[in-house]
Amino acid sequence: MNKDINIAAIIKNEIENFEGKIQNHDIGKVIIVGDGVALVSGIEKVKFGELVEFENNVLGIALNLEQDLIGVVIMASENSVFQGSIVRRTKSVISITVGDQLLGRVVNALGIPIDGKAELDNSLKSAIFTNAPSIMDRKSVDRGLKTGILAIDSLVPIGKGQRELIIGDRQTGKTTIAIDAILNQKGKDVYCVYVAIGQKNSSVAQIVSLLEKKGALEYTTVILAGASELSPLQYLAPYSGAAIAEYWMNKKKDVLIIYDDLSKHAIAYRTLSLLLRRPPGREAFPGDIFYQHSYLLERSAQLSNDKGGGSITALPIIETQAGDISAYIPTNVISITDGQIFLRDSLFNSGQKPAIDIGLSVSRVGSAAQTNLMKWASSSLKLNLAQYNELKAFAQFGSDLGPSSQLILDRGNKIYEILKQENQYPLTERQQIMLLILIRENLIDSLEQKSIPLFKSAFLKYCDSEPKFRDKIEKMDYNRVLEPNNLAGILKDITDFIEKFNLGNVF
């Protein structure tokens, strides 16, 4: 009897203390699924870019919001989602793990490690889609980001916070320039993010191996959305990279981000848009493709001192077809960025590496990103090359040239030899200035064109190894133009070296 009373009392107590918690879930149902896209009905309050969850824990992103249907891109194999599947709102936007733990790591577009190393701590996350800094949160670009490539640092200088497009046909050295820029940031307190979109996994593996070998992976994060990945992941990859870079920028750091390449990103977005039944426009791209790229690239900025002074420098890459820079995507990105480095395949095939077309390449930041000494040393370079290219085109008609015209042609050929540079061998600013002084003061006129590569190698060794000459170079103030007395002393040493070289006394 006592047992019955105790049981009844326990039940009564449980009923009295019961607190019914009602959980509301916005759910819908998959109407159509195919090609990585699901059309869902029943979820009315979902937001653009919000994560939704299917029955088997597969996630999707709501990218199309219509009156009765929602277009969701599936972040997994489409075979895992079926018609009639239940879909639930998560009420959260897609985010990615950020922080210093990502340095030296290779992750996919969702921030999941794919390098076989330790798992990441997911406690620190940032939304992939965020607004770019406002005008009042920025300041003008006035600090240079050195690539170590003489032709770029002297003719099309890049500043911290700038967006400089690298554009050209396939196999013209676009990725090589970007990777060399990463290698040159070693010891400069610049974090790097390399975003590979639609690239072959084997090519990215070689890049990761090179970065590791050169000691650059320790300050670099690689995000891979390879050619075999789903279109949604290729679409998300650059925004994920921007979110990772923004975390460091807001921590007062300088960041360099490479988007390799935005042509494949545009194709991935076109694929998604057509599957979502959006109306196609020029070249079948959706109407908002310009917005997608401008929204991405505007997130690169030089923050004001009040916001910490951090920066993101973006080097987007665009692949052209047969050198056509007037196509839709190239013209879009050219108009968004602060200049472009145009690579021409004819120059590349003739042995001019990097194959930069000086006439079509420009930096809209310009000399604001250079030190005063570099401005002075490179001031006559573009004029010399412009005169050379003009005369070269004229000389093709077989016209007889006078001595002064022939001198300009010979000098131009020698300048291009000086500008040739092997990849993975960046030059310091001091080395670049010494080579530019050779050009500025016309000291290369006494050299034969075929001997320039050997001379350049010997001269750079001389600059580093000759104690007295090295002391003069090290005393140069980058913020000031060379004093006449100092310049005269340096020119005398260089002239003596050239005389020895021409006599065969330098090896």
UniProtKB/Swiss-Prot annotation:
- Swiss-Prot/TrEMBL keywords: ATP synthesis, ATP-binding, Cell membrane, CF(1), Hydrogen ion transport, Ion transport, Membrane, Nucleotide-binding, Translocase, Transport
Tree of life domain: Bacteria
**Similarity field:** Belongs to the ATPase alpha/beta chains family.
Record-linked SUPFAM superfamilies: C-terminal domain of alpha and beta subunits of F1 ATP synthase, N-terminal domain of alpha and beta subunits of F1 ATP synthase, P-loop containing nucleoside triphosphate hydrolases
Protein's cellular compartments: Cell membrane
Q: How does it sit in the membrane?
A: Peripheral membrane protein
Cell membrane as UniProt keyword:
yes
Residues binding ATP, per UniProt: 168-175
Entry's InterPro entries? Answer: ATP_synth_asu-like_sf, ATP_synth_asu_C, ATP_synth_asu_C_sf, ATP_synth_F1_a_nt-bd_dom, ATP_synth_F1_asu, ATPase_a/bsu_AS, ATPase_F1/V1/A1_a/bsu_N, ATPase_F1/V1/A1_a/bsu_N_sf
Q: Which Gene3D superfamilies match?
A: 2.40.30.20, ATP synthase alpha/beta chain, C-terminal domain, P-loop containing nucleotide triphosphate hydrolases
Q: Name the predominant localization.
A: membrane
CDD domains in the cross-refs? ATP-synt_F1_alpha_C, ATP-synt_F1_alpha_N, F1-ATPase_alpha_CD
Q: Which NCBIfam families did the record assign?
A: atpA (TIGR00962), PRK13343.1 (NF009884)
**Which function does this protein serve?**
Produces ATP from ADP in the presence of a proton gradient across the membrane. The alpha chain is a regulatory subunit.
Subunit details: F-type ATPases have 2 components, CF(1) - the catalytic core - and CF(0) - the membrane proton channel. CF(1) has five subunits: alpha(3), beta(3), gamma(1), delta(1), epsilon(1). CF(0) has three main subunits: a(1), b(2) and c(9-12). The alpha and beta chains form an alternating ring which encloses part of the gamma chain. CF(1) is attached to CF(0) by a central stalk formed by the gamma and epsilon chains, while a peripheral stalk is formed by the delta and b chains.
Q: Where is this site: Required for activity?
A: 361
Name the Gene Ontology molecular function terms of this record: ADP binding; ATP binding; proton-transporting ATP synthase activity, rotational mechanism
Under PROSITE patterns, the record lists:
ATPASE_ALPHA_BETA (PS00152)
Q: Which EC number(s) does UniProt give?
A: 7.1.2.2
What gene is this protein translated from?
A: atpA
UniProt key word Ion transport: yes
* Gene Ontology CC terms, in alphabetical order: plasma membrane; proton-transporting ATP synthase complex
**Reactions that this protein is recorded to catalyse:** ATP + H2O + 4 H(+)(in) = ADP + phosphate + 5 H(+)(out)
Q: What is this protein called?
A: ATP synthase subunit alpha
Q: What class of enzyme is it?
A: translocase
